[in-house]
Amino acid sequence: MSIDDRKIRILQAIINDYIRTGDPVGSRTIAKNYNLGIGSATIRNEMADLEDMGYLEQPHASAGRIPSSKGYRLYVDQLMDNQMLTVEEDLRIKQYIIDSAMLEVDKIVKQTSALLSELTKLTCVIETPSVKRSFIKSIQLIKVDDHNLVSVFLTDTGVIKNHIMKLNNRVPEVETLTRINEVINNRLVNLSIQEINLEVINNLKKDLGAYEEIFNALLPILYETLNSADSTEVFMEGTTNIFNYPEYNDIDKAKEMLSLLNDKEALMELFNPQDNITVSIGDENYKPQARDCSIISAEYSFKDRPIGKIGLIGPRRINYSKVIMIMSEVIKELNNILSNPK
């Protein structure tokens, strides 16, 4: 059985109504509230066909129907109408741009997560940029006291790593320390973290020559940076948002969701953005705890280079068009803030 234009219009009306109200939808509701030009009996028959085709489900003994994951998939891919931002949403995003202008990258990322959870009323999870994907912009050794330096690594994506370097000998004078910084930067700047290999390290050792203690103090920092290149920090905002949806009044569903939200690494594995924004619905999520969820995920970028993932998680019954519009606008502004810092 193929899905014809009339069935599509009925399915679209059912999903729009269910997203708005959260109540199972009956044929009389569609006939009364949507000008489809057909009667309740015909709609009822078409709804039975849509259920047989897997686009609708009948919860419990309810006379109404709700969309299945298959129904939502067709809706997201073909049927939903585009929505615009409200004036309030637009103003809130503009304020976010102002607030983020002078912040460090990690704080911008955390603020982005808070904004998305606020505007979408969903749970937002975002990872900080992976150092592995970054290039070294500068390294500075700065005197703390007579026997301590702090090394400051800055990547092109704005990630900053600080480490204390303890020396047995006195910290070199300012002019000498300036030359040492120049040597280190000449060797390492514009390399990606992945490109710092044994050959690069040996050449740096030769370049530093007489400053062996500086090299020996710097070496473990380089190794630590390499070993932690894949590590990212994960921020989560709006954890309780999802429990405002009646779908999670069921204690077993609520427990499953809490189990998923408490495992950030497992949650990040569910974020598999392809091109632009990716929506995975219900059974499309391979983890059992996420089978009743929808996940909207995307990558954010630095100068068109993806550097991190971001995702929203909620029930299957969400306003997909609105959520996708908000996410698209916020990520566009995040990419611009990161790529064009003030």
From Swiss-Prot:
Write out the GO biological process terms.
Answer: negative regulation of DNA-templated transcription
**InterPro entries in the cross-refs:** GAF-like_dom_sf, HrcA, HrcA_C, WH-like_DNA-bd_sf, WH_DNA-bd_sf, WHTH_HrcA_DNA-bd, WHTH_transcript_rep_HrcA_IDD
Listed A to Z, the keywords are: Repressor, Stress response, Transcription, Transcription regulation
What does the record give under GO molecular function?
A: DNA binding
Say yes or no: keyword tRNA-binding present.
no
| Disulfide cysteine pairs (residue numbers) | none
Against Pfam families, the record matches this protein to: HrcA (PF01628), HrcA_DNA-bdg (PF03444)
Q: Repressor: is it a keyword of this entry?
A: yes
Q: What's this chain's function?
A: Negative regulator of class I heat shock genes (grpE-dnaK-dnaJ and groELS operons). Prevents heat-shock induction of these operons.
Question: Mind telling me which NCBIfam families this protein's record contains?
Answer: hrcA (TIGR00331)
Q: Which family does it belong to?
A: Belongs to the HrcA family.
This one is known as Heat-inducible transcription repressor HrcA
Organism, by scientific name, is: Clostridium beijerinckii (strain ATCC 51743 / NCIMB 8052) (Clostridium acetobutylicum)
